[in-house]
Amino acid sequence: MSLLVKVCGMTSKEDATMCEQLGVDFLGFIFHPSSPRNVDAAFARSVKTDGAKKVGVFVKQSATEVIETLKNGQLDFAQLHGGQNEEFCKAVGKERVIKVLWPQKYDSVKEFQADIDRFVPHCTYLLFDAGKSGGGHGIAMEFEVFKDVTIPVPWLLAGGLSAENLREALDTAQPNGVDLNSGVESEPGKKERNKLAAAFAAIGQ
């Protein structure tokens, strides 16, 4: 199957349309007030797509709030980006969960593998971000860590990905998909066509 591409931090309908025209599979909408890319459910609902799935990114909300926002924003998936546990995933529903983990926060590969195994039964996708929490900070990670773990569900790689490092990331980590954000922006929340096109060229799609 071809590589899945998610572009996160949608703040305008124009950017969403541009991403779809380029062939993006997932559009990410961030629901986190301290983020420069924060939006509300009404905006997410107003973005109509032609095949791309809409993903809500949640950090501090309760499971009830996540479910309500999924409904009100007409979102397909909840990306749980705040350390939510298995019970939280169950409440939202496995079929709608993209669970985020941060490989760099673990002291050993064994610990990292244990958390992968813990969440696999409760999500449709895993997403691995750089740093030890949060996201959208433009920091990349060491890709070699993925050679030492087994990931039995489709997974996406995030964290400072751009045209400059995408090829290395794909060749080394071999993910099922990538999550682009700050590396394809001219400023926080504003996607840049040239950077997106360069990223797609690097991916080979």
From Swiss-Prot:
State the Pfam families in the record.
PRAI
Lineage top rank: taxon:
Bacteria
Q: Does the keyword rRNA processing apply?
A: no
GO terms for biological process?
L-tryptophan biosynthetic process
Gene Ontology molecular function: phosphoribosylanthranilate isomerase activity
EC numbers listed for it are 5.3.1.24
Matching entries from SUPFAM superfamilies are given as: Ribulose-phoshate binding barrel
| Pathway(s) where this gene product acts | Amino-acid biosynthesis; L-tryptophan biosynthesis; L-tryptophan from chorismate: step 3/5
Q: Which UniProt keywords apply?
A: Amino-acid biosynthesis, Aromatic amino acid biosynthesis, Isomerase, Tryptophan biosynthesis
Alphabetized InterPro entries for the sequence: Aldolase_TIM, PRAI_dom, RibuloseP-bd_barrel, TrpF_fam
Reaction equation(s) it catalyzes: N-(5-phospho-beta-D-ribosyl)anthranilate = 1-(2-carboxyphenylamino)-1-deoxy-D-ribulose 5-phosphate
Disulphide bridges, residue numbers: none
Note the PANTHER family from the entry: N-(5'-PHOSPHORIBOSYL)ANTHRANILATE ISOMERASE
Per the record, the similarity remark reads: Belongs to the TrpF family.
The molecule here is called N-(5'-phosphoribosyl)anthranilate isomerase
- Organism of origin: Maridesulfovibrio salexigens (strain ATCC 14822 / DSM 2638 / NCIMB 8403 / VKM B-1763) (Desulfovibrio salexigens)
